[in-house]
């Protein structure tokens, strides 16, 4: 049985936590930040977990994670 390739785009976007969940970055923090409140920017800077509905797809993209 050949090895399964990892989707490199997914490997760069997601990391696995100790409990096996996937961590991701939030959107809306690249540019046009002047109109966003400081509170919002601080909250967007915090990492988030991948939703349960998308976890199966991410797991398929990262077979060895």
Swiss-Prot record:
Q: Which GO terms describe its molecular function?
A: structural constituent of ribosome
Matching entries from Gene3D superfamilies are given as: 4.10.410.60
Keywords for the protein's UniProt record, in alphabetical order: Ribonucleoprotein, Ribosomal protein
- Which terms does the UniProt entry file under GO BP? translation
Please give the coiled-coil regions recorded for this protein: none
* Source organism superkingdom: Bacteria
Q: Which family is annotated?
A: Belongs to the bacterial ribosomal protein bL35 family.
**CC terms in the record's Gene Ontology section:** cytosolic large ribosomal subunit
| Name of the molecule in the record | Large ribosomal subunit protein bL35
Give the source lineage, highest ranks first. Answer: Bacteria, Pseudomonadati, Thermodesulfobacteriota, Desulfovibrionia, Desulfovibrionales
For this protein, the record's PANTHER family field holds: 54S RIBOSOMAL PROTEIN BL35M (PTHR33343), LARGE RIBOSOMAL SUBUNIT PROTEIN BL35M (PTHR33343:SF1)
Please name the NCBIfam families in this protein's record.
Answer: rpmI_bact
